């Protein structure tokens, strides 16, 4: 694989197990000349154990139109909404609070997301999760 030249990196967020050729996946991959159905089948097979989770994926397209992809952990905001069973954050986060996040929940989210964050210490990851929660209008205990 080292002799193949990378021609494009495509970053998308796709629900786990639900990739289909409709926008935004189809146009993004079609412009790069990638087999769209081939990607959808591979992605759905790889993420069938995580249905409904919004998963960031980085697709590497090579000069011979082959591809590889890496799935990452869901965004922190999605993990927070899932932990608190929310549809969305507050429209006015500094005034309207929509929930409370405990330190145990913050730690669990930080541990899950830490490998995708550029941090070494768990405390740094927890501070990032707390900041995201505050920007969504969620109090952190």
UniProtKB/Swiss-Prot annotation:
**One of the GO BP terms on file:** translation
Modifications made to the protein after synthesis: One or more lysine residues are methylated.
What SUPFAM superfamilies does its record include?
Answer: Ribosomal L11/L12e N-terminal domain (SSF54747), Ribosomal protein L11, C-terminal domain (SSF46906)
What does the record give under GO molecular function? large ribosomal subunit rRNA binding; structural constituent of ribosome
Keywords tagged on the record: Methylation, Ribonucleoprotein, Ribosomal protein, RNA-binding, rRNA-binding
Q: Which CDD domains match?
A: Ribosomal_L11 (cd00349)
Q: Which InterPro entries does the protein's record reference?
A: Ribosomal_uL11, Ribosomal_uL11_bac-typ, Ribosomal_uL11_C, Ribosomal_uL11_C_sf, Ribosomal_uL11_CS, Ribosomal_uL11_N, Ribosomal_uL11_N_sf
Q: Which GO terms describe its cellular component?
A: cytosolic large ribosomal subunit
Q: Which PANTHER family match?
A: 60S RIBOSOMAL PROTEIN L12, LARGE RIBOSOMAL SUBUNIT PROTEIN UL11M
The function of this protein is: Forms part of the ribosomal stalk which helps the ribosome interact with GTP-bound translation factors.
The similarity comment for this entry is: Belongs to the universal ribosomal protein uL11 family.
Which HAMAP family does this one have?
A: Ribosomal_uL11
Subunit record text: Part of the ribosomal stalk of the 50S ribosomal subunit. Interacts with L10 and the large rRNA to form the base of the stalk. L10 forms an elongated spine to which L12 dimers bind in a sequential fashion forming a multimeric L10(L12)X complex.
The protein's name:
Large ribosomal subunit protein uL11
Which organism does this sequence originate in? Chlamydia abortus (strain DSM 27085 / S26/3)
The record's gene field reads: rplK
């Amino acid at each position: 694989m080292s002799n193949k030249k990378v021609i494009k990196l495509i970053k998308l967020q796709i629900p786990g197990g639900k990739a289909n050729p409709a926008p935004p996946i189809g146009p993004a991959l079609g412009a790069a000349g990638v087999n769209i159905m081939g990607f959808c089948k591979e992605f759905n097979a790889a993420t069938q154990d995580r249905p409904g989770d919004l998963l960031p994926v980085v697709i590497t397209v090579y000069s011979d139109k082959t591809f590889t992809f890496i799935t990452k952990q869901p965004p922190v905001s999605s993990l927070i909404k899932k932990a608190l069973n929310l549809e969305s954050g507050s429209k006015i986060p500094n005034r309207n609070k929509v929930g409370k996040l405990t330190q145990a929940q913050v730690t669990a989210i930080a541990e899950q997301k830490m490998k995708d964050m550029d941090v070494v210490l768990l405390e740094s990851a927890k501070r990032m999760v707390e900041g995201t929660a505050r920007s969504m209008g969620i109090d952190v205990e």
